C-alpha cells in the first residue's frame, strides 16, 4: 500500500490473540454467583447488580437523554433489550465493560458521549480508538446515525492505508474540525506527533475491543502515547467481549477507580439465539462440504472465516467460479477497496463474505445469520468473536465450524471448556431453517 511510511499498519498476522486464561465473573453483591442475564458491576464503590435495560425509546427516556438523541433512537427502531449499563456511563465515571458480542456496547459509548458533548468549533472532545479500519468506519457511522438531530456535532474517522494529507486537510479547517474523532492508534498517533490533532480538550477517551489494542505491544505503545496527550481529567471507557484476568490490570492503569461491568458469567459468554455446530472432515473435503452448505442452507448473508489472506483469495475465487456472489475482506486488500467491499456487503449487494480475523471483531452487519469457520481459529476467544457476527443483538443465527486436524479438535475442546457448552455435530439431515432464520 502507498503512504505506509507514515503509519503503523496492523496485519492479520499481528491480530493473533494471545492465549488468555479463562476468566471468572465478579460475584453479585450478596456473594452469590451472578445468574445468566444478570449485570454485575464492581468497583471502588459498593458492588452493584442490575439486570436488563430496555432499549425501547421509553427505556432510554428513563436515562434523561437529550431529546435529539431520543428522536434518533426512535428512528433507528431499537426494539431489543440490552444488558449493557448506560446509566453507569452517563454518571461520568470510568467504565471497564465486558459484554458478549452483539449486546450494544457501541451504543453505550456513542449515546453517552453524544449526551455529554457540548460541541465547541475547532475542538476535539471525544476520542474513540479501535484496532481495525472497518470497525473505525462502522463506529463513525453509528455516531452519524445517532447525531442526525445534532447538526453542530462533527465526526471524523482517521485510519491507516489512506493518504495522511487528507486527514491533515480536515484538521486544518476549523469548519470541518471534528468534535468526535474515531480511528486506529497508528494513524492517530502520527497525527498527534505531527501536531495536526490536538487532544488537549478531550473529555472522553474510549477504547473499543480494548484487549486487542492493549495485548499487542506496538499498539499499546501508540495508545499510551495518545493517552498522555489528553488531559488528566477525563472519562475513560473500555469495552470488549473478552477480558482476560491478565489484561484487566493493564486496562485499569488508564483509569481512576473504574466501575467494572460484566454482563453474564464470563464462562458463559455464549450468544443467545445462536445455534452452534461442528463438522468433522478432511482438508480436501472442505470445498465440497462448503458448496453443499451454501446450496442447501437458507441464509440472508454468510461470513466464512479462513486463517490467511492467501486462503481468503483462493476460496473467494473458487466461490465466484461456482457462481456464488462472494467478496473477500482481509489485510492484503487496499484500504479503499476494503471499505468499498465492506459497504457492498453491508448494503446487501453481496451475500457471501470470505474473511480473515481482521473482520472477526465488532463488525456489525445485521443481516448476517450464518457464520462458517472454514478454518477453525487458534483459540476460544477468537471463536466467540467470529461466530458473534451471526446472531447480533440477540437475534437468531447459525454457526458451523469445520474440524479437520488434531489442533482443531483441541481448540474445539477448549471452546467447550471455556464457555461450558457442548457443541453438537451438525446433523446429517441438516437444520430446520425456521430455527435460525428470523
UniProtKB/Swiss-Prot annotation:
Stored CDD domains: DEADc_DDX39, SF2_C_DEAD
Pfam families: DEAD (PF00270), Helicase_C (PF00271)
Domain Helicase ATP-binding: 86-261
SUPFAM superfamilies in alphabetical order: P-loop containing nucleoside triphosphate hydrolases (SSF52540)
Bias (Low complexity) ranges: 23-36
One GO MF term: RNA binding
Taxonomic superkingdom: Eukaryota
Chain ranges for the short sequence motif Q motif as given in the UniProt record: 58-86
Gene Ontology CC terms, in alphabetical order: spliceosomal complex
All residue ranges annotated as the Helicase C-terminal domain in the record: 289-434
Motif, DEAD box: chain positions: 208-211
Role description: ATP-binding RNA helicase involved in transcription elongation and required for the export of mRNA out of the nucleus. SUB2 also plays a role in pre-mRNA splicing and spliceosome assembly. May be involved in rDNA and telomeric silencing, and maintenance of genome integrity.
Domain-level remarks: The Q motif is unique to and characteristic of the DEAD box family of RNA helicases and controls ATP binding and hydrolysis.
Cross-referenced PANTHER family: ATP-DEPENDENT RNA HELICASE DBP3 (PTHR47958)
Protein name according to UniProt: ATP-dependent RNA helicase sub2
Species of origin: Aspergillus terreus (strain NIH 2624 / FGSC A1156)
Amino acid at each position: 500500500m502507498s503512504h505506509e511510511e507514515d503509519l503503523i499498519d496492523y496485519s492479520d498476522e499481528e491480530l493473533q490473540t494471545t492465549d488468555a486464561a479463562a476468566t471468572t465473573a465478579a460475584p453479585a453483591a450478596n456473594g452469590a454467583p451472578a445468574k445468566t442475564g444478570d449485570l454485575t458491576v464492581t468497583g471502588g464503590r459498593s458492588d452493584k447488580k442490575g439486570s436488563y435495560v430496555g432499549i425501547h425509546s421509553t427505556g432510554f427516556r428513563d436515562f434523561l437523554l437529550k431529546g435529539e438523541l431520543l428522536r434518533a433512537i426512535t428512528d433507528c427502531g431499537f426494539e431489543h433489550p440490552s444488558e449493557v449499563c448506560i446509566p453507569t456511563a452517563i454518571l461520568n465515571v470510568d467504565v471497564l465493560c465486558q459484554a458478549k458480542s452483539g449486546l450494544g456496547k457501541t451504543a453505550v459509548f456513542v449515546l453517552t458521549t453524544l449526551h455529554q458533548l457540548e460541541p465547541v468549533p475547532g475542538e476535539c472532545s471525544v476520542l474513540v480508538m479501535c484496532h481495525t479500519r472497518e470497525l473505525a468506519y462502522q463506529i463513525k457511522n453509528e455516531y452519524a446515525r445517532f447525531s442526525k438531530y445534532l447538526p453542530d456535532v462533527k465526526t471524523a474517522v482517521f485510519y491507516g492505508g489512506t493518504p495522511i494529507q487528507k486527514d491533515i486537510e480536515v484538521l486544518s479547517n476549523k469548519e470541518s474540525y471534528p468534535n468526535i474523532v474515531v480511528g486506529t492508534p497508528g494513524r492517530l498517533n502520527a497525527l498527534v506527533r505531527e501536531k495536526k490533532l490536538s487532544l488537549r480538550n478531550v473529555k472522553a477517551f474510549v477504547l473499543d475491543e480494548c484487549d486487542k489494542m492493549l495485548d499487542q505491544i506496538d499498539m499499546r505503545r501508540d495508545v499510551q502515547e495518545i493517552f498522555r496527550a489528553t488531559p488528566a481529567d477525563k472519562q475513560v471507557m473500555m469495552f470488549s467481549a473478552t477480558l482476560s484476568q491478565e489484561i484487566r490490570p493493564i486496562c485499569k492503569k488508564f483509569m481512576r477507580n473504574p466501575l467494572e461491568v460484566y454482563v453474564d458469567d464470563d464462562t458463559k459468554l455464549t450468544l443467545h439465539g445462536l445455534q452452534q455446530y461442528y463438522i468433522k472432515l478432511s482438508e480436501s473435503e472442505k470445498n465440497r462440504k462448503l458448496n453443499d452448505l451454501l446450496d442447501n442452507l437458507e441464509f440472508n448473508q454468510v461470513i466464512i472465516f479462513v486463517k490467511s489472506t492467501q486462503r481468503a483469495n483462493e476460496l473467494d475465487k473458487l466461490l465466484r467460479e461456482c457462481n456464488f456472489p462472494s467478496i473477500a475482506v482481509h489485510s492484503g486488500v487496499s484500504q479503499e477497496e476494503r471499505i468499498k467491499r465492506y459497504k457492498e456487503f453491508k448494503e446487501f449487494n453481496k451475500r457471501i463474505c470470505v474473511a480473515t480475523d481482521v473482520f472477526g471483531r465488532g463488525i456489525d452487519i445485521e443481516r448476517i445469520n450464518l457464520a462458517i469457520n472454514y478454518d477453525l481459529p487458534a483459540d476460544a476467544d477468537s471463536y466467540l468473536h467470529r461466530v458473534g457476527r451471526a446472531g447480533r443483538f440477540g437475534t437468531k443465527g447459525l454457526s458451523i465450524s469445520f474440524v479437520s486436524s488434531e489442533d482443531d479438535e483441541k481448540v474445539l475442546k477448549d471452546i467447550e471448556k471455556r464457555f461450558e457448552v457442548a457443541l453438537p455435530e451438525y446433523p446429517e439431515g441438516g437444520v430446520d431453517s425456521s430455527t435460525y432464520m428470523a
